[in-house]
Amino acid sequence: DAVILPGTKNTISDLLWMRQNGLEARILKHSAQNKPVFGICGGYQMLGMEISDPTGEEYGGTVQGMGLLDTKTVFRPEKHRTRVHGTFGEMKGILKEMEGLPFEGYEIHMGKTELLEGCPMNQIHDTVKKKDRQIPDMEPENRIENSTDGISHGNVYGTYIHGIFDKEKIVSEIVKSLAEKKGLSMEEVEGVDLKAFKESQYDLLADTLRKHLDMKAIYQIMGMQK
């Protein structure tokens, strides 16, 4: 029903592997049937027209992308790290109901992706809040600015933001849109609050550790009084 290309530390190598093994052809066929394709980080880079690695950060040279988005990516030595909060801008295609929904996540990548001149694609301009030191080694910035976090064209979507599907409302809208395309009714879809789920799992882990470890001895080793 939908293809999500996730991030990777080996964008070019993985793209060539997918090309050699027929996966790229299947993704292109899927997109030609007007079914959604969503690329995240390295997956976003793969969806473009070209990926260039002039300084040999990963593979070296230039390779052709899948050609589903009119973008070009150039790898650079500097790694971009930042946490972002924003809102989906203008969305087209099957995910148009996501327009205006808030999201949060983080970026960590070594490439810069630019929209090719003269292409008719919709850029997703969002207000992004970059918080200071939310993840180790992230950019020490604390400001609000307008930024292009992704690009959509028809039913093809790309973004550098990891965690963009973590919010329950976003997941629900995606499931509803996919169901409606198949003629199914999903009016009462209830998603899972991922943040609350993670907290409950952390609590279970903490309870298990307290049950099976000598916590008093551990606190003494740490120099803490408990």
Where are these predicted regions, by residue range?
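Conserved beta-strand scaffold positions in the cores of enzyme catalytic domains, especially
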Residues: 37, 68, 105-107, 150, ...
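Short, well-ordered loop/turn and helix-capping segments at boundaries between secondary-structure elements
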Residues: 33, 46-53, 71-75, 114, ...
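Cysteine-nucleophile active-site neighborhood
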Residues: 8-94, 99-104
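A glycine-rich phosphate-binding loop feature that marks nucleotide/adenosyl-phosphate handling sites
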Residues: 36, 43, 84-89, 111, ...
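Composition- and surface-driven signal marking solvent-exposed, interaction-prone regions
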Residues: 15-18, 119-123, 147, 170-176
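Terminal amphipathic helices with adjacent charged low-complexity linkers/tails
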Residues: 2-5
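Catalytic beta-strand/loop cores that center a nucleophilic Ser/Cys/Thr
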Residues: 91-154
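Acyltransferase
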Residues: 147-226
